[in-house]
Amino acid sequence: MDLRDLKTFLHLAESRHFGRSARAMHVSPSTLSRQIQRLEEDLGQPLFVRDNRTVTLTEAGEELRVFAQQTLLQYQQLRHTIDQQGPSLSGELHIFCSVTAAYSHLPPILDRFRAEHPSVEIKLTTGDAADAMEKVVTGEADLAIAGKPETLPGAVAFSMLENLAVVLIAPALPCPVRNQVSVEKPDWSTVPFIMADQGPVRRRIELWFRRNKISNPMIYATVGGHEAMVSMVALGCGVALLPEVVLENSPEPVRNRVMILERSDEKTPFELGVCAQKKRLHEPLIEAFWKILPNHK
């Protein structure tokens, strides 16, 4: 079996969506289908049940998923072991984070890591912060910078970097939304909101609605990516609740079109940190990265 086919199969087994997996694995849908067909021919069994809307694993597919996870993990461990036979650490370390985190938190960490391990090649992928935890769980990333969810997956280790301030932002330039929020007591049930489509930030705005007794909020849009939320607020589409660091690292022309209405006073802090699979913390590259984190003990 080809390792690339196993990686593709594993992603599809998690996403249950051919188009999404094809984009994530940088292949065409037809290439992805051929890879799955190749595996099915090797095993002599169908791996998925497909219809127009859903993709589900067969019993053989479930068994192959376990095999693929174990095989790819063992291969990664073998690569790391071989890499360590040289005089210093080498190999590739795959990191996932948001564009904001790539500016705000990752550089000083990478500076320390590269000073100690200059032969390690960093492969950085940026995307929606809400996807960070899943990237680690599925093995698409070795490490990720992520907001800590209410319930941390049992298989994931989390090292905190910072407690982030969360702010409610609105358009600063004259527009109907600014007029709505500029009164002494805004009617929040009529104000359009820009929301994260998933993740800890989504949970924060839901708590904010509950605290302000807004049972039926007006949702203008749900967005993947906190940076896009700032842009939509700047355009006058609505208001949004998000980590202040996202606003601070937005381009100045966008930042200047936004104002802060309030800072969240939630008792539970918004924790940002680095996450990795617990079972992989002993791998030399991940272990070395983990040790240089500021709150490592």
Swiss-Prot record:
Coiled coil: none annotated. GO terms for biological process: amino acid biosynthetic process; branched-chain amino acid biosynthetic process; regulation of DNA-templated transcription. SUPFAM superfamilies: Periplasmic binding protein-like II, Winged helix' DNA-binding domain. Transmembrane segments: none annotated. The keyword Signal does not apply. It comes from the Bacteria. The keyword DNA repair does not apply. It is found in: Cytoplasm. Keywords: Activator, Amino-acid biosynthesis, Branched-chain amino acid biosynthesis, Cytoplasm, DNA-binding, Repressor, Transcription, Transcription regulation. One of its GO terms (cellular component) is cytoplasm. Residues 1-58 form the HTH lysR-type domain. PANTHER family: HTH-TYPE TRANSCRIPTIONAL REGULATOR, HTH-TYPE TRANSCRIPTIONAL REGULATOR ILVY. Belongs to the LysR transcriptional regulatory family. This is HTH-type transcriptional regulator IlvY.
